[in-house]
Amino acid sequence: MEKKLKSWQGWLLFCGAMAVVFVLGLVVSSLMERRAETVSVFNNKRVEITGIEARNEVFGENYPRQYETWKETAKTDFKSEFNGNEAVDVLEQRPEMVVLWAGYAFSKDYSTPRGHMHAIEDITHSLRTGAPMDDKSGPQPSTCWTCKSPDVPRMMEAIGVDSFYNNKWGAFGSEIVNPIGCADCHEPTNMKLHISRPALREAFARQGKDIDKATPQEMRSLVCAQCHVEYYFKGDGKYLTFPWDKGFSVEDMEAYYDEADFADYTHALSKARILKAQHPDYEISQMGIHAQRGVSCADCHMPYKSEGGMKFSDHHIQSPLAMIDRTCQVCHRESEETLRNNVYDRQRKANEIRGRLEQELAKAHIEAKFAWDKGATDVQMAEALKLIRQAQWRWDFGVASHGGAFHAPQEIQRILGHGLDKALQARLAISKVLAQHGYTADVPMPDISTKEKAQEYIGLDMEKERKAKDKFLKTIVPEWLEKARANGRLAKL
């Protein structure tokens, strides 16, 4: 005989089913509302944008939520144990770096990076870009603008890529005026992610890859890889090029540069032909566990947020440590304190090796100069200079990637460890050269305990540099901005 449900059990089952249907209805309704709001955003644009629109404020008319969070990249109120979003004078913290960059503009000025909204201001105020008083003077090429503004692809389209690169930095001061923003990463009509800089596309092509076949998730990293990479200025035309032809590793790129017989500069003390790493964030991140598991840059640096029923990417691009609840804890269940300390532990270990490497490498440069002064020959110094080049390339590659100690901690420690080994080998090679010239005592070391003392030691006239920059900022930059406003390059909303 079949067992019948009691009356109250039937009613309980009925009510439970109704509750499930009700909840599902709410979920579907919420999803439909979100979709409707998303469609509404695209169908009710206040401004029709076509072509390359460099003025971020114009995009803000159509996408106010994204725009308002992007403006927060102007903030300088976050600080972690090793990084943050305010400009900190790294040369003041680590005066050995002045010696490592002797003969190169970075020995004058190097600070931690601020947010994207400061891109134009920071490069304009940097002592590295000099004080050009006209379109034809100054120490830097216009290639230095490449990653600073959506005005760059606009200018490339207008005058050609080669012509853009093959100019002085000061030549486009009145054109490159809007900081890193919307058009750098998005198509204007549908906001689809796109590649706006030629170097990344060209690097893929040389590897036999079609970047247009990248998945949407891959694009959430590749738009960052347009700039957060290692690159160099190739040839007299200063053509921006990624040295990826042999691979992503520090050894692969070194082999590429060696084959091309390339050096960024000749060191003022040691005479070593130095490679200056830029910021190989993308390459190093690809060697880490997160990228290998399919996590993109935007997943951690631009997490989703909800507002008014609308889900969108937070365009306040910053360290995930500033918002652990929306980044790390989306996947990891540990406490904020535990996760933060996990990051710091990796960074502390890498920085321990970094500090030792900087000290040994600075001594190697100083000792090499001492050997030259004692009459060393090119043949005698060849091995030491090769080792110095290799050591400094590994140091800079590891240090220039600001998040490398977290993105790929094992790889960063390997790179810095190899750099330290080569720096010590260089010092040993120099000691043998000195012995050949009858010198066996310790090489006297200058006082480079502060940035100012180190800059004086390598022969910089910093007062002259600052005075020239001050004049440039007070006379030339206002002219650039006035011309930009007159030509409609800055928004008037």
From Swiss-Prot:
It is an enzyme of class 1 (oxidoreductase). Heme c 3 binds at H116, C224, C227, H228. Ca(2+) binds at E230, Y231, K276, Q278. Its EC number is 1.7.2.2. Gene3D superfamilies: Butyryl-CoA Dehydrogenase, subunit A, domain 3 (1.20.140.10), Flavocytochrome C3, Chain A (1.10.1130.10). Residues 1-25 form the signal peptide. Heme c 5 binds at H290, C328, C331, H332. It catalyses: 6 Fe(III)-[cytochrome c] + NH4(+) + 2 H2O = 6 Fe(II)-[cytochrome c] + nitrite + 8 H(+). Binds 1 Ca(2+) ion per monomer. Binds 5 heme c groups covalently per monomer. InterPro entries: Cyt_c552, Cyt_c_NO2Rdtase_formate-dep, Multihaem_cyt_sf. The keyword Signal applies. Pathway: Nitrogen metabolism; nitrate reduction (assimilation). One of its GO terms (biological process) is anaerobic electron transport chain. Pfam families: Cytochrom_C552 (PF02335). It is found in: Periplasm. Heme c 4 binds at C297, C300, H301, H407. Belongs to the cytochrome c-552 family. PANTHER family: CYTOCHROME C-552, CYTOCHROME C-552 RESPIRATORY NITRITE REDUCTASE. HAMAP family: Cytochrom_C552. Catalyzes the reduction of nitrite to ammonia, consuming six electrons in the process. This is Cytochrome c-552. It comes from Bacteroides fragilis (strain ATCC 25285 / DSM 2151 / CCUG 4856 / JCM 11019 / LMG 10263 / NCTC 9343 / Onslow / VPI 2553 / EN-2).
